[in-house]
């Protein structure tokens, strides 16, 4: 029984979380270069309504497939946004400039940008200076707001939400994209997006790998307000 359960979890046929579509009808995957070539017109017709595409990381790295995915997604009916992976110990304004250079000055018709805040590498064992990380995140958000007139959604895990986002009043009014693969976000958390699993597969992309899947918390009218 334990082995069968493990197989179901690994193959994505059973998840710890399974938010019902009637409760969260707006949903979609996180898109990165590891998916390989994506046939966007077909990919977007698989009962998804949105997607966030990784654009940049730090001050120098651009996702290798970002431009193809950004352009390819224009010809679909789903709402798409771009996100940046924050380097916690690197100047936030410089990171925002890198993101802006990649995605362009005008995001009309796109979802508001997002910024991923996650502990990576040695930081999983030896936590970073959380105050420095919060300063860099705040500087990133401020520069994005100055450029596009909107604050980015903050994509965080339990650890980064607790230690960086929720503990700093500068982020009190920012929209939260919360990743929790084993349980639903706490009832007292005001979240906008929730990544609930990393074991979803679709068709029409080259790698066939498992993807992170996200739902939106709100009505269709609420969702439309996130489009620039």
Report each predicted region and the residues it spans.
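A short, Lys/Arg-enriched amphipathic alpha-helix followed by its capping loop at the start of a domain
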Residues: 42-48
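Hydrophobic membrane-insertion alpha-helices, especially the h-region
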Residues: 1-11
């Amino acid at each position: 029984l334990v082995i069968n359960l493990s197989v179901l979890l690994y193959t994505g046929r059973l998840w710890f979380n399974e938010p019902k579509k009637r409760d969260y009808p707006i949903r979609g995957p996180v898109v990165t270069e590891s998916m390989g070539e994506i046939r966007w017109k077909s990919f977007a017709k698989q009962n998804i309504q949105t997607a966030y595409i990784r654009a940049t990381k730090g001050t120098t790295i651009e996702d290798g497939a970002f431009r193809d995915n950004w352009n390819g997604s224009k010809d679909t009916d789903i709402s798409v946004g771009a996100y940046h992976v924050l380097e916690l110990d690197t100047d936030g304004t410089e990171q925002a400039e890198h993101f802006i250079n990649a995605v362009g000055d005008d995001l009309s018709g796109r979802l508001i940008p997002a910024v991923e805040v996650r502990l990576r590498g040695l930081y999983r064992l030896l936590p970073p200076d959380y105050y420095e990380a919060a300063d860099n995140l705040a500087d990133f958000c401020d520069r994005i707001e100055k450029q596009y007139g909107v604050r980015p959604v903050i994509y965080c895990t339990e650890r980064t939400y607790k230690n960086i986002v929720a503990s700093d009043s500068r982020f009190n009014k920012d929209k939260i994209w919360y990743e929790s693969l084993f349980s639903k976000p706490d009832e007292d958390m005001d979240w906008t997006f929730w990544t609930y699993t990393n074991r979803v597969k679709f068709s029409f992309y080259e790698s066939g790998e498992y993807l992170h899947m996200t739902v939106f918390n709100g009505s269709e009218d609420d969702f439309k307000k996130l489009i620039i």
